[in-house]
């Protein structure tokens, strides 16, 4: 099993805060020279610890002001129904997150839209999907906390295989 030490955790925390940091700045922040720092980053990419680097956009600046949580219950929770629903949802760009849940509902979606009219069209689409039994939605009034950085133990950790 591969272990991540304090230095690896420091690298990951720095990259989670600013993925555009230069390797030289990153190396300085964890007290390494640039080459070993670069090698550690590459190793964590190869292990799948670092999946990708992205740019986070402002939904508000882009007019995506309607943040809705949608609870979806299916008629039957059988593999074929679940798979079909998940395939449909995966094609929708407004669906930011989708989780298969325990209990009721079967799925929880977070959808980001520009208007109530767009939400109405999306809900109309959902109601027409085969196997959908019930839909409930809740609007987010205010985002109290949002983060993308994962909580990592400062002392290091062992990776799962």
Swiss-Prot record:
Residues 23-42 bind DNA. Positive regulator of the bkd operon for branched-chain keto acid dehydrogenase complex. InterPro entries: AsnC-type_HTH_dom, Dimeric_a/b-barrel, Tscrpt_reg_AsnC-like, Tscrpt_reg_AsnC/Lrp_C, Tscrpt_reg_HTH_AsnC-type_CS, WH-like_DNA-bd_sf, WH_DNA-bd_sf. Residues 4-65 form the HTH asnC-type domain. Gene3D superfamilies: 3.30.70.920, Winged helix-like DNA-binding domain superfamily/Winged helix DNA-binding domain. This is Bkd operon transcriptional regulator. The gene is bkdR. GO terms for biological process: response to amino acid. It comes from Pseudomonas putida (Arthrobacter siderocapsulatus). Keywords: Activator, DNA-binding, Transcription, Transcription regulation. One of its GO terms (molecular function) is sequence-specific DNA binding. GO terms for cellular component: cytosol.
